[in-house]
Amino acid sequence: MIEMARLKEFYKKDVVTMMMKRFNYSSVMEVPRILKITLNMGVGEAVGDKKVMNHAIEDMTLISGQKPVVTKARKSIAGFKIREGWPIGCKVTLRRERMYEFLDRLISITLPRVRDFRGLNPKSFDGTGNYSMGIHEQIVFPEIDYDKTDGIRGLDICITTSAKTNEEAKALLEAFNLPLKDKDRK
């Protein structure tokens, strides 16, 4: 038998009942859930050096556990010295078990390793129940070996939920122990 991800089990047992009581849902299917987590790494330096892109792909593969898709420039921009079709980044979409395992590692291991971390910005919700955040250094992930990296790159993390409002999404992510800052603290 395949073992279920720890956070998925926690969601099914505890989070669903807590959310049903708090928001008075009539059905279990109304309870918001995390649909996907998207990781995006923009690699502007890849324009000058193609090896940088390969290192970014390796890092993203180690962080996410699956091979990323290379994103290409949609149009040429002379100011950035890029042409249409050139690789400028990579992204990964995590769903199901891998998504819950990544979220578990993010909350319990990675975020506590971020330098001067005081919590995530509660204003980063988009109005429709999705949360976006950025990590400035990929080396905070335990999968990345600091001595073997070619440079420090950041990445964006988008958590897409089925919540209709920011309040529901915030309650859902707080139930998963995502460390959001208090509004009164700066």
Swiss-Prot record:
An example Gene Ontology biological process: translation
CC annotations in GO: ribonucleoprotein complex; ribosome
Keywords noted in UniProt: Ribonucleoprotein, Ribosomal protein, RNA-binding, rRNA-binding, tRNA-binding
Gene Ontology MF terms: rRNA binding; structural constituent of ribosome; tRNA binding
UniProt-listed HAMAP family: Ribosomal_uL5_B (MF_01333_B)
Quaternary data: Part of the 50S ribosomal subunit; part of the 5S rRNA/L5/L18/L25 subcomplex. Contacts the 5S rRNA and the P site tRNA. Forms a bridge to the 30S subunit in the 70S ribosome.
Family: Belongs to the universal ribosomal protein uL5 family.
Function field: This is one of the proteins that bind and probably mediate the attachment of the 5S RNA into the large ribosomal subunit, where it forms part of the central protuberance. In the 70S ribosome it contacts protein S13 of the 30S subunit (bridge B1b), connecting the 2 subunits; this bridge is implicated in subunit movement. Contacts the P site tRNA; the 5S rRNA and some of its associated proteins might help stabilize positioning of ribosome-bound tRNAs.
Protein name: Large ribosomal subunit protein uL5
Organism, scientific name: Legionella pneumophila subsp. pneumophila (strain Philadelphia 1 / ATCC 33152 / DSM 7513)
Gene transcribed to yield this protein: rplE
